[in-house]
Amino acid sequence: KKIRKTNIDRMKNIGKGIHMLSTDIGVDLGTASILVYIKGKGVVLKEPSVVAFDRDTNKIKAIGEEARLMLGRTPGNIVAVRPLRQGVISDYRVTEKMLKYFIQKAIGKRMLKKPRISVCVPSGVTEVEKKAVEDATLQAGAREVAIIEEPIAAAIGAGIDISRPCGNMIVDIGGGTTDIAVISLGGTVVSTSIKIAGDDFDEAIVRYMRKKHNLLIGERTAEDIKIKVGSAYPRTEIATMNVRGRNLVTGLPKTVEVTSEETQEALKEATSQIVEAVHSVLEKTPPELASDIADRGIVLTGGGSLLQGLEELIESKTGIHTMTAEDPMTAVAIGTGKFIEFLAGYRDDK
């Protein structure tokens, strides 16, 4: 009963903040990627959260995919940066310009009325960090802004009916943060947010290649290794790929073969921390909801959940069936866009 009251009160408060708001756009403002969802059209834009600018003039040269291709390949005066770090804004000015660019690209410049935008944030952010996201979105051209916690958005996007009085567990692994939450009656009952996610997988691979093979590789190469042979759990067949980088001893280009077994070793520390965080949330979950989760399983969302073997690792360590959402990359964006419809439906039911 106590849980019911807490979550209904929370939903009433959210409702007041965006009274009768039928949002036009949902934005998944991720550390690695930005996705834009428009009602009736679905996800219309997915681009890397990267901006390239000239250090001498401070002018922006490229945004999104074009800027990502410049990472590690720019002349000295042009810098490619990620204005969001671990789920929060690290460079306000650049984030605002990036948001404005993506919103205009998604809706076109012909729209006469400013859009209403819902944006998601990690569950562990402070009120100050939430305010920064809200302000940046308003400055980028929003008429009204609604802020939504990522696990709630992920659950809606994964097709879970969050309004029901039963426990659902979501593990949303993005680029900068992993958000883990138990959701019931439209609210978060227990949650945690850790700053270990997809970017940390890439960094762990860079460190491993340097230490094990004396090979210096860039961010894009590390991501490529993660996608092609990355593993969190032993594969039935070992996968291999050739990786080019710079030999740290000779300074010359060098090619080495990397196996999925090696990536499992490289990623062990990061994946173990995610498993520990899942354990921690399960330990704090009320017994009735824990029973629901044991029946319904754990749902993974976010780009980081695509790491091969992550489902098996979590399932083997918790004993609870673990599955990845149908389209984990877009679940948060879809849920962010649909959240307001959910609130409107909730008020109609009252």
List each language-model region with its residue ranges.
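Nucleotide/phosphate-binding catalytic cleft detector across ATP-hydrolyzing
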Residues: 1-173, 181-299, 305-350
